[in-house]
Amino acid sequence: MGKRLLDKLWERHVVTTNENGLDLLYIDLHLVHEVTSPQAFEGLRLTNRTVRRPDLTFATMDHNIPTKDVWNITDRIAKQQLDTLRANCKQFQVPLADIGDEEQGIVHVIGPELGLTQPGKTIVCGDSHTATHGAFGALAFGIGTSEVEHVLATQTLWQRKPKAMGIELKGKLQKGVYAKDIILHLLSKYGVAVGTGYVMEFYGETIQVMEMEERMTLCNMAIEGGAKAGIIAPDEKTFAYVKGRKYAPRDYETFEKKWFELYTDADAIYDLHISIDVTDLAPYVTWGTNPSMGVRIDEKLPEKHDVNDERAFSYMGLIPGQSTYDIPVQHVFIGSCTNSRLSDLEIAASVVKGRKVKEGVRALVVPGSKRVRDAAMQKGLHHIFEEAGFEWREPGCSMCLGMNPDQVPEGEHCASTSNRNFEGRQGKGARTHLVSPAMAAAAALYGHFVDIRKESYDGAISYS
């Protein structure tokens, strides 16, 4: 029987197996940020240990940064965490993309753009959305603070091998429908627990024509379906993306030959298989308090089925049967590790070009990294956004989570390109609706959701 991509990635990294069936995996890249690392570094100090492989560790500042003025950090805890990371990286000789550095940005944006993320690697980070890097054919997953310390000290991690889920995507997406809509559709149909105990492998004709930044969006939200990770077999698009980046292998051709072996064999069998035809897929909007509570833009909100639905409707201030077009939007956030890359900003800019944000709507664009921001400004995107009435911010996690000054006021609705819509995720009482960058941009213009497919704009990603 053939091997799945998961099998090949896993087997390449097993150091040993213990009597309980746990495998000790070697970790190729450890990404670090200011929130989940302080206790881990302190643990090293208390035991008089060092970081085993500083050269395989890379840190950045992202979660706590105030994106309006990155140098004016007024929150005491945020400043302490940022200062602590800076001191820890200096003491343990870990490379750091500090505030103002050209490499700084959201950890899951800078990894790929710097070439740190590569096919075949095991990648961990103390952050749920580490699965993003799986778009490159890497086995990438989030870990807890105690595991962060373990990896810092040993460059290994004890893990039980997950099962493999194959998700075949076939068909061609309509204009105005994106990877964000695919994953929201998957979650709405199968729920937030469908991937529990699995690694999701996305494959099929839709994936083959999808660009790398869209693939990252898919893998980023695999965790929202309960999966350990999301992966996509690397191909020519992957190799072209990695080649020439700062931390890409110097002996690139040798690595590329190894990367070509990273695919699921034709006779391999997945533990669970799902097939989705995306041809008739529509833009999605979440209405509730987890990412599976979503509907097509042309559907009414569902009826209540259980106490969770009842609580979600109450929290969100919505009613069953309500039209998605009638959901008010007071805030728009275009950013996060899900949708803050250059192509995301280009799409949003094409929607708002020459138009104005609806009066009473606060709209933010937060590039995912300094490099994304600079590239967008070279293209003049910041002028398009600012002339339309958007705020153009510095890179950081921003309004994705209520951990910095960028928050949604209690009881108000936000069209967000982020990945989670939990209660209080964007601030106490904030009401979050997950959408694609195109849908978020359009909502800013109208003050409510509209069907982006009916809008005239030139921001469709080419799937030719």
From Swiss-Prot:
It catalyses: (2R,3S)-3-isopropylmalate = (2S)-2-isopropylmalate. This is 3-isopropylmalate dehydratase large subunit. Its EC number is 4.2.1.33. Catalyzes the isomerization between 2-isopropylmalate and 3-isopropylmalate, via the formation of 2-isopropylmaleate. Keywords: 4Fe-4S, Amino-acid biosynthesis, Branched-chain amino acid biosynthesis, Iron, Iron-sulfur, Leucine biosynthesis, Lyase, Metal-binding. Its cofactor is [4Fe-4S] cluster. The gene is leuC. Belongs to the aconitase/IPM isomerase family. LeuC type 1 subfamily. Coiled coil: none annotated.
